[in-house]
């Protein structure tokens, strides 16, 4: 099954509260002609109108905000990191969710941000530096190989974010079309990564799995796979009514979430190691 949404793209910004108060930034941008609308998050706004690219302002360069979809802000919120947590971000670039986690942790605790691509690792480093993040270790490695080092040294995590590579990333590339083979490849890789993630969790640790794909094979089927394969993991119920103003509904597995257009499509599930 291939689902492609090509409607009008909504634009949002996440205010970096490590550097600036949301209302202060809102006034600065509105004074420049940007029209902002509040969301369910007091530090996120929808950009209704802007006389210039929202990614080319002094405020952006100062690290006062991150342009990203409201959908992509949900996984870090669902993971709900504490200030003293030891966290793994398995597929971290370009850093929107990594820097969001750091913001929620108030730059405390420790985040290990892993990215397989050298090029994307540069973007990750750039965003972490721009946003003033101080609690993050960046690792340029293949998670499928890096896990051997972690397991050998008995390094386990309180919480893990797996925002998995998916066919939704291919859709964003205007020069490519998604094929059934792309979906199958992504699904196999996602199953491998989520299995690794559970291996690296401490007992009672939690993992949030997310994609920007609409395909069942990359979402519910991945969760079904890991729940059937392992007896040391359980699904944690997420409630859709916590995210007001978004077209969000329960997924095809009870307790999972799906975000639908006009918001950026997303799937979110939460697991606990038992």
From Swiss-Prot:
Its main location: cytoplasm. NCBIfam families: nop2p (TIGR00446). Catalyzes AdoMet-dependent formation of m5C in tRNA. Cytidine residue at either position 40 or position 48 is likely to be methylated. This is tRNA (cytosine(48)-C(5))-methyltransferase. It catalyses: cytidine(48) in tRNA precursor + S-adenosyl-L-methionine = 5-methylcytidine(48) in tRNA precursor + S-adenosyl-L-homocysteine + H(+); cytidine(40) in tRNA precursor + S-adenosyl-L-methionine = 5-methylcytidine(40) in tRNA precursor + S-adenosyl-L-homocysteine + H(+). It is found in: Cytoplasm. Transmembrane segments: none annotated. The keyword Transport does not apply. Its EC number is 2.1.1.-. GO terms for cellular component: cytoplasm. SUPFAM superfamilies: S-adenosyl-L-methionine-dependent methyltransferases. GO terms for biological process: tRNA methylation. The active site is at residue 212. S-adenosyl-L-methionine binds at residues 91-97, 115, 120, 142, 163, 169, 189. InterPro entries: MeTrfase_RsmB-F_NOP2_cat, MeTrfase_RsmB-F_NOP2_dom, Nop2p, RCMT, RsmB/NOL1/NOP2-like_CS, SAM-dependent_MTases_sf. Gene3D superfamilies: Sun protein, domain 3, Vaccinia Virus protein VP39. Belongs to the class I-like SAM-binding methyltransferase superfamily. RsmB/NOP family. Keywords: Cytoplasm, Methyltransferase, RNA-binding, S-adenosyl-L-methionine, Transferase, tRNA processing. GO terms for molecular function: RNA binding; tRNA (cytidine-5-)-methyltransferase activity.
